[in-house]
Amino acid sequence: MPSAFVHSRSSTARSGGEAMETFLNAFRDGYARVAGARERWDDAQKASTALLGAVVNAFERMPALERGATREDVLGNDEFGKRVVEAQYASLDRLFTRLREECDEFERLTRELERAKTDAWMRTRNLTPPPKRAGGERAGPQPSIAECVLGLEDVWRMHRDECALKREIVKQAATCEDVEDLKVLHRLYCAQPNLDPEELRTIMDRVPVKSVEADLHR
């Protein structure tokens, strides 16, 4: 085989790999944004789970407070007992207000994930020349374009569904009158059934996010 032909093929393969690396660098930026959004999601999950837990505790105390409010020998006088119950209901209102605010934060984060997914699709559609095999071809150890894009799509879809579930749970909890039903809602909220931790970890490992330290030493 002529050496010039071998050199040509080698150069073409090398330039193709470099082009793919450049293209994947753009995806790394998208994955970095997704990683940041997911960290804020975890923070919102911790805060809102605690709030819903406080709602459960307040509901558990409410029957005893209402019974005590009708007995002067327990709380001293009837008016004081009523004020205690009213204060507890006011506290519940504040808790649900904060829960709705956390749901708003989940929706904002879901929109961020949607933008990352949409940007990835647009970047792929505008790629010239079009990727081979509809983006399903890998370049060495690098994930394929299709894997990168579909990963972002799956992350957005899972969080979109979980966001809708959280909103519905908070809505139902606000009108729930049975503390056991409320506990079930709380467990469902904590479980985040639409988010598969292992699948999310696999997706986020698909395109490694470059560290700040690595960028500083380039």
Named regions from a protein language model:
Residues 2, 6-54:
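N-terminal alpha-helical scaffolding segments that mark the starts
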Residues 14, 18-28, 52-154:
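Extended, amphipathic alpha-helical coiled-coil scaffold segments used for oligomerization/tethering
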Residues 115-218:
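Charged, alpha-helical coiled-coil and adjacent rod-like segments in eukaryotic scaffold subunits
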